[in-house]
Amino acid sequence: MIRGLGIDVVELDRIEAALIRFGDRFLARILTPAERAALPPIPLTRTAGLFAAKEAAAKALGTGFAQGVAFHTLEILSDAAGRPALTLHGPALARAEALGATSWHVSISHSRDTAAAVVVLEG
């Protein structure tokens, strides 16, 4: 049974502007240390995809970025096959459990100008 669904689309220009203006401070605000360590040398599309995925996850949880759900409570790393895998921490995990979710799935896609992500919570 679906317990939550979230989708987000972000323009690459918006993320590029934040990277130019704030650089590592922006990355540290939205990404966990493990996510930052996994970034490629030119991080624009990957960062935009992760941003969209975290926004989608916050929507799927039904809280947005409130009630303790924050960028660092949502972590997306690639599995051995290169697929994005969402890990929930702290308040994000507690919220998913309160919704009856026992598993969650994330899909990230990019175009020339945008990144998009969908998160589904199942239980």
Swiss-Prot record:
Q: Which gene encodes it?
A: acpS
This molecule's function is given as: Transfers the 4'-phosphopantetheine moiety from coenzyme A to a Ser of acyl-carrier-protein.
Q: Where in the cell is it found?
A: Cytoplasm
GO annotations under biological process?
fatty acid biosynthetic process
Which SUPFAM superfamilies does its entry note? Answer: 4'-phosphopantetheinyl transferase
Q: Which cofactor does it need?
A: Mg(2+)
Any idea which UniProt keywords this protein has? Cytoplasm, Fatty acid biosynthesis, Fatty acid metabolism, Lipid biosynthesis, Lipid metabolism, Magnesium, Metal-binding, Transferase
Q: Which family does it belong to?
A: Belongs to the P-Pant transferase superfamily. AcpS family.
Q: Does the keyword Protein transport apply?
A: no
Recorded catalytic reaction(s): these are:
apo-[ACP] + CoA = holo-[ACP] + adenosine 3',5'-bisphosphate + H(+)
* GO MF term set: holo-[acyl-carrier-protein] synthase activity; magnesium ion binding
Cellular component (GO) terms are: cytoplasm
Protein name in UniProt = Holo-[acyl-carrier-protein] synthase
**Protein residues bound to Mg(2+):** D8, E55
Q: Does the keyword DNA-binding apply?
A: no
Species: Solidesulfovibrio magneticus (strain ATCC 700980 / DSM 13731 / RS-1) (Desulfovibrio magneticus)
> Which E.C. number(s) belong to this protein?
2.7.8.7
Alphabetized InterPro entries for the sequence: 4-PPantetheinyl_Trfase_dom, 4-PPantetheinyl_Trfase_dom_sf, ACPS, Ppantetheine-prot_Trfase_dom
| Pfam name, any one | ACPS
